[in-house]
UniProtKB/Swiss-Prot annotation:
Cellular component, GO annotation: cytosol
Species of provenance: Streptococcus pyogenes serotype M12 (strain MGAS2096)
Keyword Cell membrane: no
GO molecular function, one term: 6-phospho-beta-galactosidase activity
Protein name in the entry: 6-phospho-beta-galactosidase
EC number assigned by the record: 3.2.1.85
Catalytic machinery residues: 160, 375
Binding site for D-galactose 6-phosphate: 19, 116, 159-160, 297, 428-429, 435, 437
InterPro entries tied to this protein: 6P-beta-galactosidase, Glyco_hydro_1, Glyco_hydro_1_AS, Glyco_hydro_1_N_CS, Glycoside_hydrolase_SF
Keywords assigned by UniProt, alphabetized: Glycosidase, Hydrolase
Pathway linked to the protein: Carbohydrate metabolism; lactose degradation; D-galactose 6-phosphate and beta-D-glucose from lactose 6-phosphate: step 1/1
Length: 468
């Protein structure tokens, strides 16, 4: 049976400042930790990325032509406050006013994120969100944006608090490149969630119009053998690290006893302790019912197997299938069933995981109000032929994920939109430019845009709300 989506459903495309804008030092923009980190550790930089800083009118015109009626944009904190605090950079403010005006001119609703992996260098080198001073700096930055950009109707505090802690302190592929420090992972998650809560409360108390929420990456975790209690436990612990800890903070305003039992076990095995304060929980509790929406970024699921050994994580950054490894002491290791498809970057393709995650939020956090799928898409080594890309694999991936969203809506979940990652090809943090996701192919030499086959398919779905 052909599935459909509601008439008012948003068919969006997603971007992020550092991955799309380029212009990393233009018009007074301050440095971010990624600038030097990429220079020192990788074979690419974010200059000029997709040159969105200059070419946003082209991308928004294409959006309008191809039925994309929502766009995720992030504000680069260091364009507004070059050092994260202090003097405001008027050119940065002007740029975003112009960008949002163009969005509205093209009837593409901007969903605006305040922080998408790009803390200003001056604050990042001072401990980033492990330093509690950063909470105050973030709230001040948020307040300025809420006041200044009243034309924005949808705000998101953070993009992917989970992968930030994970990338910075567990896998070590994000600056500062620390590995296997689980106490830092949880502390980073916690302090960022407190920052989120404080910003949401300020937004509501100040009476700003519009809506506010947060975007969490929520990869679904399954036991490799559902009949083996040790595998079930491994999946539960892995879920706490990546999902439950931050979801509890968002919607319970505290960490459930079961969550804290898991956290304490992980820290007992791996070392370290957390600094969780009374005022933190007061802030979390005050915001737990104020989130207007939850953004879910979903790309993949994982299967977990019990494992007794040392932590070892190998990141597959070059698309060499089968080269990744993930095992955490006291938690478990990832081991996928052989029949589940994977991308070249070892990302597991499992649309059912998105359905299960949406229904989990609905069941476990009934005070959620609505959900947007704020990122979902397929990273590919696209072949550019005849001025396009015949990306049938991407179409199939998106189609299957839209179908399970339709199922979730039928089963009572309030899902209001979908943002494909990414609108156009962008720079990928730890994979460079080979891993493409866009609806529009970008020739990074000339910065020309070319609609892929998926763009024409997406346009038809957006126009008809019929998934076929």
């Amino acid at each position: 049976m052909t599935k459909t989506l509601p008439k008012d459903f948003i068919f969006g495309g997603a971007t992020a400042a550092y991955q799309a804008e380029g212009a990393t030092h233009t018009d007074g923009k301050g440095p971010v930790a990624w600038d030097k980190y990429l220079e020192d550790n990788y074979w690419y930089t974010a200059e000029p990325a997709s040159d969105f800083y200059n070419r946003y009118p082209v991308d928004l015109k294409l959006s309008e032509e191809f039925g994309v009626n929502g766009i995720r944009i992030s504000i680069a904190w260091s364009r507004i406050f070059p050092t994260g605090k202090g003097e405001v950079n008027p050119k940065g403010v002007e740029y975003y006013h112009n960008l949002f005006a163009e969005c509205h001119k093209r009837h593409v609703e901007p969903f605006v994120t305040l922080h998408h992996f790009d803390t200003p260098e001056a604050l990042h080198s001072n401990g980033d969100f492990l330093n509690r001073e950063n909470i105050e700096h973030f709230v001040n930055y948020a307040e300025l944006c809420f006041k200044e950009f009243s034309e924005v109707n949808y705000w998101t505090t953070f993009n992917e608090i989970g992968p930030i802690g994970d990338g910075q302190y567990l896998v070590g592929k994000f600056p500062p490149g620390i590995q296997y420090d689980l106490a830092k992972v949880f502390q980073s998650h916690h302090n960022m969630m407190v920052s989120h809560a404080r910003a949401v409360k300020l937004f509501k108390d100040s009476g700003y119009s519009g809506e506010i929420g947060v975007v969490h990456a929520l990869p679904t975790k399954y036991p490799f053998d559902a009949n083996n209690p040790d595998d079930v436990r491994a999946a539960e612990l892995e879920d706490i690290i990546h999902n439950k800890f931050i979801l509890d903070a968002t919607y319970l305003g505290k960490y459930s006893d079961k969550t804290m039992e898991g956290v304490n076990h992980i820290l007992e095995v791996n070392g370290g302790e957390l600094d969780l304060r009374e005022e933190d929980f007061a802030a979390l509790d005050a915001a737990k019912d104020l989130n207007d929406f939850l953004g879910i970024n979903y790309y993949m699921s994982d299967w977990m197997q019990a494992f007794d050994g040392e932590t070892e994580i190998i990141h597959n950054g070059k698309g060499e299938k089968g080269s990744s490894k993930y095992q955490i002491k006291g938690v478990g290791r990832r081991k996928a069933p052989v029949d589940v498809p994977k991308t070249d970057w070892d990302w597991i393709i499992f649309p059912q995981g998105l359905y299960d995650q949406i229904m989990r939020v609905k069941a476990d956090y009934p005070n959620y109000k609505k959900i947007y799928i704020t990122e979902n898409g397929l990273g590919y080594k696209d072949e550019f032929v005849d001025n396009t890309v015949y990306d049938d694999g991407r179409i199939d991936y998106v189609k299957k994920h839209l179908e399970v969203i339709s199922d979730a809506i039928s089963d009572g979940a309030n899902v209001k939109g979908y943002f494909m990652w990414s609108l156009m090809d962008v720079f990928s943090w730890s994979n460079g430019y080979e891993k493409r996701y866009g609806l529009f192919y970008v020739d990074f030499e000339t910065q020309e845009r070319y609609p892929k086959k998926s763009a024409y398919w997406y346009k038809k779905v957006a126009e008809t709300q019929v998934i076929e």
